[in-house]
């Protein structure tokens, strides 16, 4: 099977499997504010991702590319919607285009359709610094995502089986590319120990890619004759990943992704410490179900509803929202307690 065929399978399986509410964000409840002393028109949702400034705290996270006409059309529509909404956009892994120049167009279309927007390049941790530079140049990227997908590779029938040297390669990439490097998980979450190693290696931000969104173990298992089903429930939830990393690295930049589906999810993720939030599966479904116009409407709706939530919480800025008091309960509370995180630090701030 070619890489392009595999990418098309990934898209179809991602849409058929969908997402479940297993992000841990349902364990998070905001403390109501009866006197917010704020007007909706005062709310400012601009944010920073490391040194990058963005007018939006949500972006279209990495999905696809290198799968021929199908992924070309998807990326074209995503780029148009991102441009019109004024939000950043990440492309899927560009390794296919580095290995097969005929696939470059499915990535280059993103910059063509969105000449002035924030665009993130994307490669796996097997990439070299030279490949990283080429990926950035290919689409005139403002940042580079390096994705960590160990579980996906292990379950993938033709996937990698060696993950040695990944941190060293990431460190080399961080020191040699001219744009900020974001290291991201792909739906299995991230621990504070892993995040610490990545910050030390030079990552400008980590995208925690929490459990509860698109499940690449399930996707790859659908492609196997004999399934490795125990990996389908493997990972750290989005909420738990955010809270435990923030407890250890309060001044470092985190991005939240992994099953976010609406403005309340976005608000909770930011209150748990994220500077920005990425959505992939939710936006892909919106595009598939309702077309480009429907996707744009969904993005705009989430941004408007986020402003409403910030208004009732009295949070004028994203920095204010990051300090909004909240209560953590259930399985997320249990996980964090066992991991040595004092959850009351969120409720009494």
Swiss-Prot record:
Pfam families: FMN_dh (PF01070). Transmembrane segments: none annotated. GO terms for molecular function: FMN binding; isopentenyl-diphosphate delta-isomerase activity; magnesium ion binding; NADPH binding; oxidoreductase activity. Substrate binds at residues 6-7, 152. CDD domains: IDI-2_FMN. Its EC number is 5.3.3.2. Keywords: Cytoplasm, Flavoprotein, FMN, Isomerase, Isoprene biosynthesis, Magnesium, Metal-binding, NADP. Its main location: cytoplasm. FMN binds at residues 62-64, 93, 122, 184, 214, 258-259, 280-281. One of its GO terms (cellular component) is cytoplasm. It is found in: Cytoplasm. Homooctamer. Dimer of tetramers. Belongs to the IPP isomerase type 2 family. This is Isopentenyl-diphosphate delta-isomerase. It comes from Bacillus subtilis (strain 168). The lineage of its organism: Bacteria, Bacillati, Bacillota, Bacilli, Bacillales.
């Amino acid at each position: 099977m070619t890489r392009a065929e595999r990418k098309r399978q990934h898209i179809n399986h991602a849409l058929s499997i969908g997402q479940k509410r297993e992000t841990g964000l349902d364990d998070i409840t905001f403390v109501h504010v009866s006197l917010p002393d704020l007007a909706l028109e005062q709310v400012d949702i601009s944010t920073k991702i490391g040194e990058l400034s963005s007018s939006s705290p949500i972006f279209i996270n990495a999905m696809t590319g290198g799968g021929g006409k199908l992924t070309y059309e998807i990326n074209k529509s995503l780029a148009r919607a991102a441009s019109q909404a004024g939000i950043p956009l990440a492309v899927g892994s560009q390794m296919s285009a580095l290995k097969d120049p005929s696939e470059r167009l499915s990535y280059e279309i993103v910059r063509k359709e969105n000449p002035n927007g924030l665009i993130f390049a994307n490669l796996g941790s097997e990439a070299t610094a030279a490949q990283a530079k080429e990926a950035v140049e290919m689409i005139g990227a403002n940042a580079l995502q390096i994705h960590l997908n160990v579980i996906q590779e292990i379950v993938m029938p033709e996937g990698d089986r060696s993950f040695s040297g990944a941190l060293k390669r990431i460190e080399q990439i961080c020191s040699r590319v001219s744009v900020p490097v974001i290291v991201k998980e792909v739906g299995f979450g991230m621990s504070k120990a892993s995040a610490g190693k990545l910050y030390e290696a030079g990552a400008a931000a980590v995208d925690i890619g929490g459990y509860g969104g698109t499940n690449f173990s399930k996707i790859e298992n659908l492609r196997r004759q004999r399934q490795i089903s125990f990996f389908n429930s493997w990972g750290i939830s989005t909420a738990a990943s955010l809270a435990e990393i923030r407890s250890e690295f309060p001044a470092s930049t985190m991005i939240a992704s992994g099953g976010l589906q609406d403005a309340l999810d976005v608000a909770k993720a930011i209150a748990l410490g994220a500077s920005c939030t990425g959505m992939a599966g939710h936006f892909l479904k919106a595009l598939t179900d309702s077309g480009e116009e429907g996707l744009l409407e969904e993005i705009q709706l989430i941004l408007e509803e986020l402003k409403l939530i910030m208004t009732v919480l009295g949070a004028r800025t994203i920095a204010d929202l990051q300090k909004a008091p909240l209560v953590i309960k259930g399985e997320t509370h249990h996980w964090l307690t066992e991991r040595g995180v004092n959850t009351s630090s969120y409720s009494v701030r």
